[in-house]
């Protein structure tokens, strides 16, 4: 069996070789070797990348639409070693104990969601207490596990939809890209974000320095992750390399990923492929890649015109060997479809899964969420519930006021029906009396009354207006023979009447 370290050296040589058409990858499962490929990209290139994330195609848990979700990630920190003192001073000023505790809790929840054990962070014995804290860049990397991108949304979604790399360099382009996640990366100091698509997903690289890679690097990285389309020539500007605009809004959503792949994080160290590295992610039992001895010759004196001949000469020497399984692979069965847990560990996982689904449901009903963490979600939910309570109280008060008005009108109608003689008199009076009401504005009205001049109709009109709490702005009375015409401009107070309602009330009180 060929040593795995030789395979890793072979991948590094592939990334650092001279510009030329790359070799076709061997038939190797991407899932089993994805951590090694990410390590090879970070260690095999000269650019100071801070992290590498591979977004793989999947489906949304709720809508069922095709999205890009977290597949795997490796964090190195880039050139943070050079600015450790500056970062330490910044954390001392900006980080509070509550923020540190909140970030620690989120890290523990992410780790329990993944594997149920302590997060694999390499401790630095020579560093002080501040060096073991989570920096803003590390926090941005960890929170990326909860992101997903729809078709054509976000930098990764655009790269996967167009099958062309997306590169933004400089703070102006990052903040002007229209992507919320890119803007958050600019807040933590990112100056370059690169997304390279392949058939299996999208590789995202980021750095705190401005980097302008060439198309040869794109081709080699795409080859490493199972791509087949190559780019010709190095771009002169961002517009030549990326034909589409980045001004469109980023519609990426934050969703919980119940089963993300582990995050490989080293505290202030670059990841490498040496056998002594304690945080090197070993691929599970599966295929092991070996190119053989002739691969070294393929990197010398290669001609693009004889590329097909090189494939025929090199590929037969590539060997895919299967490691011997040492026994049945242990692992927990999925909890779906099982009512009772197997043990207390499985019960705890099922409980956390139910709790996460409840948080997803709560997130769906709360209209405005300030942050993506659970604490902020609960605070926003409490504020929203209090707002609904206040609205319900206002509706109850309005309902009570309407009931009071209805009861008063009901009493007036009962009094009219209780005395037949009064009703007859009112009918007779209504025949001789004509009342017109016109609502001028929201609270102003004009009243016109035509009646006989007997029994002091002017006094009765003023008494009716006083009973109805109407303020008289102007009034006039004119008499022609036995006919009296009264006009009054009134203003409504606390009670607002409709036109027919005010006419009926005046008719009942005057007659």
UniProtKB/Swiss-Prot annotation:
Q: Name one GO biological process term.
A: hyperosmotic salinity response
Residue ranges annotated for the bHLH domain, each copy included: 339-388
Among CDD domains, the record links this protein to: bHLH_AtAIB_like
Q: Which GO terms describe its molecular function?
A: calcium ion binding; DNA binding; DNA-binding transcription factor activity; protein dimerization activity
Offer a single GO CC term for the protein. Answer: nucleus
Q: What induces it?
A: By UV treatment.
Indicate where this protein resides in the cell.
Answer: Nucleus
Q: Which Pfam families does the entry mention?
A: bHLH-MYC_N, HLH
> Which UniProt keywords are given for this protein, alphabetically ordered?
DNA-binding, Nucleus, Transcription, Transcription regulation
Q: Which SMART domains match?
A: HLH
Instruction: List the signal peptide residues.
Output: none
Q: What's the domain of life for this entry?
A: Eukaryota
Is Ribonucleoprotein among this UniProt entry's keywords? no
Main localization, broad class:
nucleus
Its subunit composition reads: Homodimer.
Q: Which PANTHER family match?
A: MYC (PTHR11514), TRANSCRIPTION FACTOR BHLH28 (PTHR11514:SF133)
Name this protein carries in UniProt: Transcription factor bHLH28
Q: Origin organism of this chain? A: Arabidopsis thaliana (Mouse-ear cress)
């Amino acid at each position: 069996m060929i040593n795995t370290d030789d395979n890793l050296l072979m991948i590094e040589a592939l990334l650092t070789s001279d510009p030329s058409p790359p070799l076709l990858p061997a038939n190797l499962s991407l899932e089993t070797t994805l951590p090694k490929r990410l390590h090879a990209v970070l260690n095999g290139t000269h650019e100071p990348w801070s992290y590498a994330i591979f977004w793989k195609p999947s489906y949304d848990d709720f809508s069922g639409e095709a999205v890009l979700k977290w597949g795997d990630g490796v964090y190195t920190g880039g050139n943070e070693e050079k600015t450790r003192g500056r970062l330490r001073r910044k954390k001392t000023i900006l980080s509070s104990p509550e923020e540190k505790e909140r970030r620690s809790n989120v890290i523990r929840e992410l780790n329990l969601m993944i594997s149920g054990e302590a997060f694999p962070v390499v401790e630095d014995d020579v560093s002080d207490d501040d060096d073991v804290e989570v920096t803003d860049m590390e926090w941005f990397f960890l929170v990326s596990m909860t992101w997903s991108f729809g078709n054509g949304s976000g930098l990764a979604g655009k790269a996967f939809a167009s099958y062309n790399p997306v590169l933004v360099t400089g703070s102006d382009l990052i903040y002007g890209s229209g992507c919320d996640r890119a803007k958050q990366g600019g807040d933590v100091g990112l100056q370059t974000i690169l997304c390279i698509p392949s058939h299996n997903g999208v590789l995202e690289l980021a750095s705190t320095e401005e980097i302008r890679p060439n198309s040869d690097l794109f081709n080699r990285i795409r080859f490493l992750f199972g791509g087949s389309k190559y780019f010709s020539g190095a771009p002169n500007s961002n517009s030549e390399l990326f034909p589409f605009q980045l001004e469109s809004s980023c519609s990426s959503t934050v969703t919980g990923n119940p089963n993300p792949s582990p995050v490989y994080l080293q505290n202030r160290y670059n990841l490498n492929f040496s056998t002594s590295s304690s945080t090197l992610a070993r691929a599970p039992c599966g295929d092991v890649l070996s190119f053989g001895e002739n691969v070294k010759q393929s990197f010398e004196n290669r001609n693009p015109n004889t590329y097909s001949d090189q494939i025929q000469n090199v590929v037969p020497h590539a060997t895919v060997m299967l490691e011997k399984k040492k026994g049945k692979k242990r692992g927990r069965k999925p909890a779906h479809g099982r009512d009772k847990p197997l043990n207390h560990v499985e019960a705890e996982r099922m409980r956390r899964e139910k709790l996460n689904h409840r948080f997803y449901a709560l997130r769906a009903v709360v209209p405005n969420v300030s942050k993506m963490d659970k604490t902020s979600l609960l605070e926003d939910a409490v504020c929203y519930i209090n707002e609904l309570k206040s609205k319900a109280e206002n509706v109850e008060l309005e309902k009570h006021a309407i009931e009071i008005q209805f009861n008063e009108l009901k009493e007036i109608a009962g009094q009219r029906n209780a005395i037949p003689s009064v009703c007859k008199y009112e009918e007779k009076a209504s025949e001789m009396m004509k009342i017109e009401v016109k609502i001028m504005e929201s609270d102003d009205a004009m009243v016109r009354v035509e009646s006989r001049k007997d029994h002091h109709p002017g006094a009765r009109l003023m008494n009716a207006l006083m009973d109805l709490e109407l303020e008289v702005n102007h009034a006039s009375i004119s008499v022609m023979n036995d006919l009296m015409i009264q006009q009054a401009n009134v203003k409504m107070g606390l009670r607002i009447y409709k036109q027919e309602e005010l006419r009926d009330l005046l008719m009942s009180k005057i007659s």
